[in-house]
């Protein structure tokens, strides 16, 4: 393993990663091995379902947000989820946590490490490794601006005359931001995402050592899943797209080797919101990069299927899903703290259909974020909306909203891989326009924070949409977790019965089969399927004949 680490370092750095740097790294890894005593789960299974949430999601009058979350989780969520993905809980200055001031601390206004440790006693933990950039308010960046020894090349200074037209831009913002140094010179620094998020310079061995320290800290604090945020942008080469470069993949291989060495069983998940073929490249050879990749094409394809009442595009894509090894799987989701990405649709749907979907959602109140293209044009890259409101129309009844929403999540839970559900989804949340107006950015539409008493009251009120969604979705998750056919590694096929109905059989090594039927239309569907007998686990109705009737937006799990 140590030889593998050394080989990757040589490929990335050549002679610039010196024997002194290597000794520092080895010392840190040996120290981390002694500190990391918690045993990881050996392999994922059907019981693994992840909750995605902010650490400050709930507040109360007498406790800080993290202990308040722990109380809420214990009462409402612990029996449903196996893992909690706590979005960045470190001190931050912008982007709701993704502009990190200090990687090693918990934001004091949210709580402390002890609160996270307590959560880890009743749940597996997933942390964000915000590896591409850090806050302009951080000590590291202040030291850089002050030209302190050891920080000379922590960030990336570029001559503004450099031709950077080939660089992939995820935002409609300037790539370079000018900053004044202590000696009054001006440096133009690489800022992929915003002028408050300064890209780290991985050409510097000191940056690599500092970020490995961060990773080892998270492993010692109990992270069993580690999300590599915006990882595709880590290595920069002017004159190229600066995304998915070979040395980015080599750094991931290096981090994988380090994790396998000090905390075997830890799962690396890469976050690359890009077209599907680029996304799956982060599996590497199947045993040397990510254990899981975010299934970014799933949210917009499920949305497209329900909006169009047509499953053909979703099925055509899913029929080609292949994994490089049994050591890899998908990290499936429908909603997250970000919007619904459109880039993962490109290559799967014609651009005209993507724009048609965007326009339809805009008419229903969704907000759209745009990116600049190298040719000077701009394209929509993200729809900002709760998944609840994305699936339904303004005039829809709550009963219809709930049915469409549960249908979509049944598809999610039926797919191979580990499913993740965003806190706003399990809470049945609608668009938060007041939050957008107050905070001034589109993504706030799906990031509302709650007083714990307020949300508890709504969940207890049987007349509310929240109550219906929480209980129906909880029941669905519980069913999935108790049936081995849904194991991420088990056999998966998908086909269309007609343009509005699809079938997903899942079978295990014992030969047991569970078949999902999904009607994505507003119409009753009568389908003829031979030799499909058993009991629908959801409605608890026996299926005896060949003709099966599906109500609008109905799902069956037949076993």
From Swiss-Prot:
EC number assigned by the record: 2.4.1.352
GO molecular function, one term: glucosylglycerate phosphorylase activity
Enzyme class: transferase
Disruption phenotype: No visible phenotype when grown on glucose.
UniProt entry keywords in alphabetical sequence: Carbohydrate metabolism, Glycosyltransferase, Transferase
Pfam families cross-referenced by the UniProt entry: Alpha-amylase
Cross-referenced SMART domains: Aamy
Function comment: Catalyzes the reversible phosphorolysis of glucosylglycerate into alpha-D-glucose 1-phosphate (Glc1P) and D-glycerate (also called (R)-glycerate). May be a regulator of intracellular levels of glucosylglycerate, a compatible solute that primarily protects organisms facing salt stress and very specific nutritional constraints. Cannot catalyze the phosphorolysis of sucrose. Does not act on other sugars such as alpha-D-galactose 1-phosphate, alpha-D-mannose 1-phosphate or beta-D-glucose 1-phosphate; in vitro D-erythronate can substitute for D-glycerate with a much lower efficiency.
Family label: Belongs to the glycosyl hydrolase 13 family. Glucosylglycerate phosphorylase subfamily.
Name of this chain's protein: Glucosylglycerate phosphorylase
Native species: Escherichia coli (strain K12)
Lineage, opening ranks: Bacteria, Pseudomonadati, Pseudomonadota, Gammaproteobacteria, Enterobacterales
Gene: ycjM
